[in-house]
A protein has these predicted regions:
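Non-catalytic terminal/accessory segments
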Residues: 1-321
């Protein structure tokens, strides 16, 4: 807009405050720029004017004070003390024993946020209609691309200071829906024990007892060799049954518009979860999950999340893509 931070003065700040009070403040269209994506395309960013950045930062601080304490712990994007690393650590610690991954992909999320749904969601916690009208002004401000003005009817511009927290507020409903879904889905206290493993374990305990009291070197060497072989056998035998129809678990983590679900259960369970969350996204949030990119992947193969490949062997292995 031709104005810089160096030109900021008390008078200019007072003018902004007054225009906010009497609701004459009108955000300027964001300047659209493009940055290259890894897949070869371009990602559009909307760069606000300096005054709009200033007002948006104040609005962001207000929204954060209202909402941060109510967000779910499974949300890791654009939040204080959370990051890609905390999301991956969450997976490493919480997704133990996962048999299937569901990779979530929301089609054009930032461009398709429904303004009316977002404002109604904000209204559930914010009673100040003047503040809500200001947020709507930012949503409707539009953008300038190649000197041409374009109005925005949906979405929140990537590059806007309040866009990340508005995105989290929008998807917080989904986070809470998933947590309720998990409570209904989970079943059983623990997996059914594998009788073969515990039979071998009993043999190992008895061998160790014999070794403690045995004095004959030849017999002791023979018992030691048996114990070693038994230990090797036990490494390849699970202590519980992988497929226990009376035991199910579901885990979830989200970073911005990327999410992944871990399931201990059957592929049929995963297909139902995918169908249910697709319907919720469409019916409640007016968003579309990509049928091609929302994948169900066996945990022994690799699922992608935040640029990492996730798989389950005897322990989690995460390697940089």
């Amino acid at each position: 807009d031709g104005k810089t931070i160096d030109q900021m003065s008390i008078q200019r700040i007072e003018h902004i405050i007054e225009s906010l009070k009497n609701e004459t403040y009108q955000p300027k269209p964001a300047k659209r720029v493009y940055i290259p994506k890894k897949n070869g395309g371009n990602r559009p960013l909307g760069i606000p004017s300096f005054e709009d950045k200033l007002v948006q930062e104040v609005a962001r601080m207000i929204l954060e004070a209202i909402y941060e304490g109510h967000f779910e712990s499974t949300s890791h994007g654009f939040r204080p003390y959370k990051s890609c690393h905390t999301a991956l650590t969450h997976i490493q610690h919480q997704f133990t024993g996962t048999r299937w991954f569901i990779e979530g992909d929301i089609k054009g999320f930032f461009d398709n946020i429904n303004h009316n749904i977002l404002i109604d969601t904000l209204r559930e916690r914010i009673s100040d209609e003047r503040f809500l009208r200001l947020v709507r002004k930012f949503l409707n401000a539009g953008y300038v691309d190649n000197w041409k003005y374009n109005r925005t009817y949906s979405g929140t511009p990537q590059g806007g200071i309040i866009s990340p927290i508005l995105a989290n507020i929008y998807l917080d409903k989904f986070d809470k829906y998933i947590n309720e879904y998990i409570e209904r889905f989970n079943k059983g206290e623990k997996k059914r024990r594998n009788a073969v493993y515990f039979q071998k374990n009993t043999q190992a305990v008895n061998l160790r007892k014999k070794l403690k009291v045995e004095t004959d070197p030849c017999v002791k060497a023979e018992l030691t060799e048996k114990a070693k072989k038994l230990q090797i056998e036990m490494r390849n035998i699970p202590c519980s049954h992988d497929m226990d129809e009376n035991y199910r678990r579901m885990k979830y983590v989200r970073y911005a518009d990327d999410f992944i679900i871990g399931v201990i259960g059957s592929k049929v369970d995963c297909e139902k979860i995918k169908a249910d969350i697709t319907k919720y996204m469409s019916d409640v949030l007016n968003l579309e999950l990509s049928a091609e990119k929302t994948l169900i992947t066996h945990a022994q193969d690799t699922a992608k999340f935040l640029g990492y490949e996730l798989s389950v062997r005897k322990s989690y292995a995460m390697k940089r893509n």
